[in-house]
Amino acid sequence: MFYPYNYSNLNVSTMPALPGISAFDGMQDEENVEISPERKYQTLLPVLTNSHVVENELKHKLNKTAFDFRYQTKSENGSEKWEPKYLITPNLQTRSVSFDNSSVQYNSDSSEKSSLSQLTCNSSIIQQPENGIVSNDAYNKMANSRYSLKTRKQRTDPRNTLSDEEDLEQRRKYICKICARGFTTSGHLARHNRIHTGEKNHCCPYKGCTQRFSRHDNCLQHYRTHLKKGQ
Protein backbone atom coordinates (compact mmCIF):
# COMPACT_ATOMS: atom_id res chain seq x y z
CA MET A 1 0.00 0.00 0.00
CA PHE A 2 1.31 3.50 -0.84
CA TYR A 3 1.84 5.88 2.09
CA PRO A 4 2.15 9.61 1.39
CA TYR A 5 4.64 10.04 4.23
CA ASN A 6 7.68 8.12 5.39
CA TYR A 7 7.17 6.46 8.78
CA SER A 8 10.59 4.86 8.95
CA ASN A 9 12.04 7.47 11.31
CA LEU A 10 8.84 7.83 13.38
CA ASN A 11 8.92 6.69 16.98
CA VAL A 12 5.70 4.76 17.40
CA SER A 13 5.92 4.66 21.17
CA THR A 14 5.52 8.47 21.35
CA MET A 15 2.33 8.54 19.28
CA PRO A 16 -0.94 9.02 21.18
CA ALA A 17 -3.19 6.05 21.58
CA LEU A 18 -6.23 6.01 19.32
CA PRO A 19 -9.55 4.31 20.07
CA GLY A 20 -9.25 0.64 19.15
CA ILE A 21 -5.60 1.05 18.09
CA SER A 22 -2.81 0.84 20.67
CA ALA A 23 -0.22 3.14 18.99
CA PHE A 24 0.03 0.70 16.05
CA ASP A 25 2.15 -1.60 18.30
CA GLY A 26 4.95 -1.45 15.74
CA MET A 27 2.70 -2.80 12.99
CA GLN A 28 3.73 -1.75 9.48
CA ASP A 29 0.89 -3.18 7.44
CA GLU A 30 -2.78 -2.16 7.33
CA GLU A 31 -3.86 -5.78 7.26
CA ASN A 32 -2.51 -6.34 10.78
CA VAL A 33 -4.60 -3.49 12.26
CA GLU A 34 -7.62 -4.82 14.13
CA ILE A 35 -10.36 -2.65 15.67
CA SER A 36 -12.53 -4.11 18.40
CA PRO A 37 -16.27 -4.06 17.56
CA GLU A 38 -17.06 -2.40 20.91
CA ARG A 39 -14.89 0.66 20.16
CA LYS A 40 -15.60 0.86 16.46
CA TYR A 41 -18.44 3.35 16.83
CA GLN A 42 -17.08 5.30 19.80
CA THR A 43 -16.36 8.99 19.37
CA LEU A 44 -13.69 11.15 20.90
CA LEU A 45 -16.33 13.19 22.77
CA PRO A 46 -16.89 12.30 26.44
CA VAL A 47 -20.15 10.56 27.28
CA LEU A 48 -22.35 12.64 29.59
CA THR A 49 -23.71 9.86 31.76
CA ASN A 50 -24.56 12.38 34.49
CA SER A 51 -26.25 15.05 32.39
CA HIS A 52 -28.54 16.07 35.24
CA VAL A 53 -25.49 17.04 37.30
CA VAL A 54 -24.28 19.35 34.54
CA GLU A 55 -27.77 20.81 34.14
CA ASN A 56 -28.14 21.49 37.86
CA GLU A 57 -24.73 23.13 37.98
CA LEU A 58 -25.67 25.36 35.05
CA LYS A 59 -28.94 26.38 36.70
CA HIS A 60 -27.07 27.20 39.90
CA LYS A 61 -24.66 29.47 38.03
CA LEU A 62 -27.48 31.22 36.16
CA ASN A 63 -29.48 31.82 39.32
CA LYS A 64 -26.42 33.08 41.14
CA THR A 65 -25.72 35.53 38.33
CA ALA A 66 -29.34 36.68 38.10
CA PHE A 67 -29.79 37.31 41.82
CA ASP A 68 -26.33 38.67 42.55
CA PHE A 69 -27.03 42.38 42.83
CA ARG A 70 -23.43 43.42 43.58
CA TYR A 71 -20.12 43.24 41.83
CA GLN A 72 -16.60 43.74 43.13
CA THR A 73 -14.58 46.76 42.01
CA LYS A 74 -11.23 48.26 42.87
CA SER A 75 -10.88 51.86 43.92
CA GLU A 76 -8.01 54.21 43.11
CA ASN A 77 -6.10 53.37 46.27
CA GLY A 78 -6.23 49.64 45.47
CA SER A 79 -8.92 48.65 47.97
CA GLU A 80 -11.75 46.39 46.87
CA LYS A 81 -15.37 47.28 47.39
CA TRP A 82 -18.79 45.97 46.35
CA GLU A 83 -21.11 48.12 44.30
CA PRO A 84 -24.71 47.43 43.21
CA LYS A 85 -25.27 46.19 39.68
CA TYR A 86 -28.64 47.82 39.23
CA LEU A 87 -30.14 51.20 40.00
CA ILE A 88 -31.74 51.09 43.41
CA THR A 89 -34.77 53.32 43.82
CA PRO A 90 -35.31 55.09 47.14
CA ASN A 91 -37.39 53.22 49.67
CA LEU A 92 -40.82 54.76 49.31
CA GLN A 93 -43.04 54.95 52.32
CA THR A 94 -45.91 52.51 52.06
CA ARG A 95 -49.39 53.67 52.89
CA SER A 96 -51.39 51.67 55.39
CA VAL A 97 -55.15 51.83 55.74
CA SER A 98 -56.87 51.07 59.04
CA PHE A 99 -60.61 50.46 59.22
CA ASP A 100 -62.44 50.94 62.51
CA ASN A 101 -65.95 51.70 63.71
CA SER A 102 -65.61 55.46 63.40
CA SER A 103 -63.80 56.38 60.20
CA VAL A 104 -61.13 55.43 57.71
CA GLN A 105 -57.66 56.74 58.58
CA TYR A 106 -54.74 57.05 56.16
CA ASN A 107 -51.17 57.04 57.50
CA SER A 108 -49.34 59.25 55.01
CA ASP A 109 -47.56 62.59 54.79
CA SER A 110 -50.30 64.05 52.63
CA SER A 111 -52.86 66.26 54.35
CA GLU A 112 -55.53 65.61 51.75
CA LYS A 113 -58.62 63.80 52.92
CA SER A 114 -60.25 61.15 50.82
CA SER A 115 -63.93 60.98 50.15
CA LEU A 116 -63.94 57.53 51.69
CA SER A 117 -63.19 58.99 55.14
CA GLN A 118 -66.92 59.15 55.86
CA LEU A 119 -67.43 55.42 55.30
CA THR A 120 -67.32 52.93 58.15
CA CYS A 121 -66.36 49.29 58.25
CA ASN A 122 -65.33 46.65 60.80
CA SER A 123 -62.07 45.11 59.67
CA SER A 124 -58.45 44.66 60.67
CA ILE A 125 -55.51 46.80 59.56
CA ILE A 126 -54.45 46.09 55.98
CA GLN A 127 -50.83 46.82 55.21
CA GLN A 128 -48.70 46.17 52.17
CA PRO A 129 -46.31 43.26 52.89
CA GLU A 130 -42.58 43.71 52.51
CA ASN A 131 -42.23 41.04 49.81
CA GLY A 132 -45.14 42.46 47.80
CA ILE A 133 -47.12 39.17 47.97
CA VAL A 134 -50.61 39.22 49.45
CA SER A 135 -51.84 36.00 51.01
CA ASN A 136 -55.22 34.49 50.21
CA ASP A 137 -56.62 35.37 53.64
CA ALA A 138 -55.59 39.01 53.32
CA TYR A 139 -57.03 39.18 49.81
CA ASN A 140 -60.35 37.76 50.99
CA LYS A 141 -60.45 40.29 53.83
CA MET A 142 -59.84 43.16 51.42
CA ALA A 143 -62.52 41.89 49.04
CA ASN A 144 -65.05 41.52 51.86
CA SER A 145 -64.18 44.99 53.16
CA ARG A 146 -64.73 46.57 49.75
CA TYR A 147 -68.04 44.74 49.34
CA SER A 148 -69.24 45.81 52.79
CA LEU A 149 -68.18 49.41 52.09
CA LYS A 150 -70.10 49.44 48.84
CA THR A 151 -73.18 47.88 50.44
CA ARG A 152 -73.11 50.28 53.35
CA LYS A 153 -72.73 53.27 51.04
CA GLN A 154 -75.74 52.17 49.02
CA ARG A 155 -77.79 51.75 52.17
CA THR A 156 -76.77 55.11 53.67
CA ASP A 157 -77.26 57.02 50.41
CA PRO A 158 -80.77 58.55 50.43
CA ARG A 159 -80.95 58.13 46.67
CA ASN A 160 -80.63 54.35 47.05
CA THR A 161 -83.37 53.81 49.61
CA LEU A 162 -85.44 51.71 47.19
CA SER A 163 -84.83 48.01 46.77
CA ASP A 164 -84.18 46.35 43.41
CA GLU A 165 -87.81 45.30 43.00
CA GLU A 166 -89.10 48.74 43.90
CA ASP A 167 -86.62 50.35 41.52
CA LEU A 168 -87.76 48.08 38.70
CA GLU A 169 -91.38 48.88 39.39
CA GLN A 170 -90.55 52.58 39.36
CA ARG A 171 -88.92 52.28 35.93
CA ARG A 172 -92.03 50.53 34.56
CA LYS A 173 -93.89 53.76 34.04
CA TYR A 174 -95.74 52.68 30.88
CA ILE A 175 -98.87 50.92 32.10
CA CYS A 176 -101.28 48.93 29.96
CA LYS A 177 -104.80 50.35 30.33
CA ILE A 178 -106.40 46.95 29.88
CA CYS A 179 -104.39 44.59 32.11
CA ALA A 180 -102.40 47.18 34.13
CA ARG A 181 -99.11 45.58 33.20
CA GLY A 182 -96.08 47.89 33.34
CA PHE A 183 -93.30 48.30 30.76
CA THR A 184 -90.07 50.28 30.71
CA THR A 185 -90.46 51.64 27.15
CA SER A 186 -93.36 52.83 25.04
CA GLY A 187 -92.41 50.42 22.25
CA HIS A 188 -92.86 47.43 24.52
CA LEU A 189 -96.23 48.78 25.59
CA ALA A 190 -97.35 49.24 21.97
CA ARG A 191 -96.26 45.71 21.12
CA HIS A 192 -98.18 44.42 24.12
CA ASN A 193 -101.34 46.31 23.15
CA ARG A 194 -101.53 44.36 19.88
CA ILE A 195 -102.28 41.27 21.93
CA HIS A 196 -105.48 42.87 23.21
CA THR A 197 -106.49 44.54 19.94
CA GLY A 198 -105.59 41.61 17.68
CA GLU A 199 -103.80 43.84 15.18
CA LYS A 200 -101.61 42.01 12.67
CA ASN A 201 -100.03 44.67 10.53
CA HIS A 202 -97.09 42.59 9.24
CA CYS A 203 -97.84 40.45 6.17
CA CYS A 204 -95.61 37.65 4.91
CA PRO A 205 -93.77 38.94 1.77
CA TYR A 206 -93.65 35.48 0.20
CA LYS A 207 -95.79 35.20 -2.94
CA GLY A 208 -98.96 33.25 -2.31
CA CYS A 209 -98.71 33.34 1.51
CA THR A 210 -101.49 35.14 3.39
CA GLN A 211 -100.08 34.85 6.90
CA ARG A 212 -100.14 38.01 9.04
CA PHE A 213 -98.30 38.73 12.28
CA SER A 214 -98.45 41.33 15.02
CA ARG A 215 -94.67 41.46 15.36
CA HIS A 216 -92.11 42.14 12.65
CA ASP A 217 -89.56 39.63 13.96
CA ASN A 218 -92.15 36.84 13.94
CA CYS A 219 -93.00 37.71 10.34
CA LEU A 220 -89.36 37.48 9.28
CA GLN A 221 -88.92 34.18 11.07
CA HIS A 222 -91.93 32.78 9.21
CA TYR A 223 -90.60 34.10 5.89
CA ARG A 224 -87.31 32.22 6.38
CA THR A 225 -89.24 28.95 6.49
CA HIS A 226 -90.36 29.54 2.89
CA LEU A 227 -86.78 30.18 1.82
CA LYS A 228 -85.56 26.99 3.42
CA LYS A 229 -88.25 24.95 1.68
CA GLY A 230 -87.34 26.44 -1.70
CA GLN A 231 -83.66 25.46 -1.43
UniProtKB/Swiss-Prot annotation:
Transmembrane segments: none annotated. Signal peptide: none annotated. GO terms for cellular component: chromatin; nucleus; transcription regulator complex. Coiled coil: none annotated. Keywords: DNA-binding, Metal-binding, Nucleus, Phosphoprotein, Repeat, Repressor, Transcription, Transcription regulation, Zinc, Zinc-finger. It is found in: Nucleus. A zinc finger (C2H2-type) spans 174-196, 202-226. One of its GO terms (molecular function) is RNA polymerase II-specific DNA-binding transcription factor binding. Disulfide bonds: none annotated. InterPro entries: Znf_C2H2_sf, Znf_C2H2_type. One of its GO terms (biological process) is negative regulation of pseudohyphal growth. Present with 556 molecules/cell in log phase SD medium. This is Transcriptional regulator NRG1. It comes from Saccharomyces cerevisiae (strain ATCC 204508 / S288c).
